[in-house]
Design a protein with these regions (language model features):
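N-terminal signal-anchor/first transmembrane alpha helix
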Residues: 1-34, 104, 114, 118
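Interhelical loop and adjacent transmembrane-helix boundary motif
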Residues: 2-5, 67, 74, 241-288
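Cytoplasmic-entry segments and transmembrane alpha-helices of multi-pass inner-membrane transporters
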Residues: 4-9, 100-135, 196-197, 210-211, ...
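C-terminal transmembrane helix and the adjacent membrane-cytosol boundary/short C-terminal tail
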Residues: 7, 185-196, 200, 266-298
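Transmembrane alpha-helices
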Residues: 11, 122, 174, 180-194, ...
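Short membrane-interfacial helix/loop motifs at transmembrane-helix boundaries
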Residues: 22-74, 245, 298
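Membrane-interfacial helix termini and adjacent extracytoplasmic/periplasmic loops
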Residues: 54-55, 132-173, 207, 243-247
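Transmembrane alpha-helix signature in integral membrane proteins
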Residues: 73-107
Length: 298
């Protein structure tokens, strides 16, 4: 194997080492440190300047005080559970919205597909913050939605949507909808229409054929889309902060407040480590699913 090939193969590992493993070790080091009124606001238990003796001192005096604190304070585990619940619910809602859109795009005339694909990708051309702030203008008590419903006479007083979990769901679904549509579209595009006809010829109803053929063959895209939505939604900060307000409890908000408001880097690092461990579960499941799909395709 020549040097250039080794270099190309090693690039992803160097990328992971520099941008994942090293930052993870730094955060883990802070999580094992003690809080201190200083800059930075922690007293490290590992001093690299001491060499091996520093590592020995760390192991001998190792304690997980910050992790124990997270278990004792119900705010944190409630935030984890709330984040999982909100992310899972938003993922299901995104699937319910995204699948019909992807299905419609696949069945649209060929000359329409590039334009429809452009409409799906178009929101990425604008700032994420601007898009979230736009929803504040839509969902507030004096926003466009309430003004329109009041004008129609559908409601007699403004609906309270902003600063609720409903607004958070709307924001997450809108933001991550393309991540659901695109993998489902990629799976449905490979579907042979003759399979549906064959299923109906064998006695399946249209609904039965749709479920047994279309949905089944789109399963890889559905699974990929669900993971692509659930994983970032679990640690979301901006959407619950701007659309959910103080009423929405998510671990991303708690992590932000610990770092920048309370300046308790040690507890915040412990929160981040546990969040990362939670995220490893869907990532591993996603990789196993991808491996099964590759093996099935051989």
């Amino acid at each position: 194997m020549n040097f250039s090939r080794k270099f190309l193969i090693g690039l992803p590992y160097v990328w992971l080492l520099v941008l994942f493993l090293v930052p993870f070790l730094i955060v883990f080091k802070i999580a094992l440190s003690d809080y201190a009124i200083s800059i930075p606001p922690y007293a490290p238990t590992l001093e690299l300047a001491n060499g091996w003796q520093g590592i020995v001192d760390l192991i001998s005096g190792l304690d997980f005080e910050n992790f124990v604190f997270l278990l004792d304070d119900d705010l944190y585990w409630k935030a984890y559970l709330s984040s999982v619940q909100i992310a899972a619910t938003a993922t299901v809602l995104t699937l319910l919205v995204g699948f019909p859109i992807a299905y419609g795009m696949v069945n649209a005339p060929d000359e329409w597909r590039p334009s429809l694909m452009m409409l799906v990708i178009l929101p990425f051309w604008t700032s994420f913050l601007i898009r979230v702030y736009a929803w504040i203008g839509l969902l507030s008590n004096e926003g466009l939605l309430n003004s329109f419903l009041l004008w129609l006479g559908v409601i007699s007083e403004p609906l309270i949507i902003l600063n609720t979990n409903i607004a958070v769901y709307i924001g997450i679904v809108y933001t991550y909808l393309p991540f659901m549509i695109l993998p489902i579209y990629a799976s449905l595009e490979k579907l042979d229409a003759s399979l549906l006809e064959a299923a109906q010829d064998l006695g399946c109803t249209r609904i039965g054929a749709f479920w047994s053929v279309t949905v089944h063959l789109a399963k890889p895209g559905i699974i990929a889309g669900c993971f692509l939505v659930f994983i970032p939604a679990l640690g979301e900060v901006v959407i619950p902060s701007l659309l959910g307000g103080s009423r929405t409890l998510m671990i991303g908000k708690v992590l932000w407040e610990e770092f920048f408001s309370n300046r308790d880097w040690t507890v915040a690092s412990a929160v981040a480590i546990i969040l990362l461990l939670i995220l490893v579960i869907p990532i591993v499941l996603f990789q196993r699913n991808e491996q099964k799909q590759r093996e099935a395709g051989k």
